[in-house]
Amino acid sequence: MDIQLKRGLLDVCVLAAIKNEDSYGYKIIKDMKPYIELSESTLYTILKRLETANMLLVRTVEHGGRLRKYYHITGLGLKRIEEFKEEWKEMMSIYRFVTKESDENDET
């Protein structure tokens, strides 16, 4: 898979994981695990990129004597999810076209 496409998909997956509630690194990985395998280092790179792009806000909270960063999605982050949904509709249309061509060739 193209690296830029994969990066974009992972960014949107992380945004979707915190869309409904603020979350922290370990919980994001745990919530995403049934759908996609993501290492801690990859996740924190994505979180930093999304924070820099103003799609996430970060707050630090003490939890059990340790500091934990909580991530909150911004309006820009929500907008990115909606843009992705529209882009994906187009991608699915292209996919159907490509596989239709393949299916027709298989039948001949």
Where are each of the predicted segments found?
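Beta-hairpin "wing" of winged helix-turn-helix
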Residues: 53-67, 72
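Residues that scaffold the ATP/ADP-binding catalytic core of kinase and kinase-like folds
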Residues: 17, 80-81
